[in-house]
């Protein structure tokens, strides 16, 4: 498995991945406080070679949150690309992510985070932290939800 975090580059990289809006029964959004920067973000990550996006998000959610998700419980929200998906990493890497965004309302397991996170917490939609890593993805989800 080769993920961009393992490489050291000083040019812009293009990376495909997936992220998830995970909602609890109170309609709160799960965010992770990332260990590599002082920002809250959505669970998700990069796609492995030959992997389907559905498998990417199911794997990333399990790795990062310990939650189990079934493919039939994935709701496609959007595919997001462009400059809004630019990430400047502390090691100097610059990555533009093509991100498949899912919404997940049904899952099982006990929430536990891995070493990629300092903390995880469900937030009320109107009380999200200001220091977000994925504000564009959250806004896309909120806009789509409002238009339904």
Task: Please tell me what each predicted stretch does.
Residues 67-109:
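Active-site segment of metal-dependent pyrophosphate-handling enzymes
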Residues 15, 35-37, 42, 95-99:
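Short connector loops at helix/strand junctions that flank enzyme active sites
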Residues 1-19, 25, 92-93:
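Acidic, metal-coordinating catalytic segment for phosphate/diphosphate chemistry
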Residues 28-29, 108-112:
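Short helix-loop capping/hinge motifs at secondary-structure junctions, enriched
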Residues 38-40, 110-148:
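Nudix hydrolase/Nudix homology domain
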């Amino acid at each position: 498995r080769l993920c961009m975090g393992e490489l050291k580059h000083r040019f812009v990289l293009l990376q495909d991945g997936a992220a998830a809006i995970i909602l609890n029964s109170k309609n709160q959004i799960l965010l992770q406080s990332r260990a590599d920067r002082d920002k809250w973000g959505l669970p998700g990550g990069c796609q492995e070679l030959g992997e389907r996006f559905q498998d990417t998000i199911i794997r990333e959610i399990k790795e990062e949150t310990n939650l189990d998700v079934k493919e039939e419980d994935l709701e496609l929200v959007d595919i997001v690309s462009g400059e809004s998906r630019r990430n400047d990493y502390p090691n100097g890497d610059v990555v533009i992510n093509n991100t498949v965004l899912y919404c997940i309302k049904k899952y099982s397991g006990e929430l536990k985070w891995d070493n990629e996170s300092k903390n995880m917490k469900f937030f009320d939609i109107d009380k999200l932290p200001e220091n977000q890593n994925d504000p564009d993805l959250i806004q896309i989800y909120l806009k789509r939800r409002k238009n339904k």
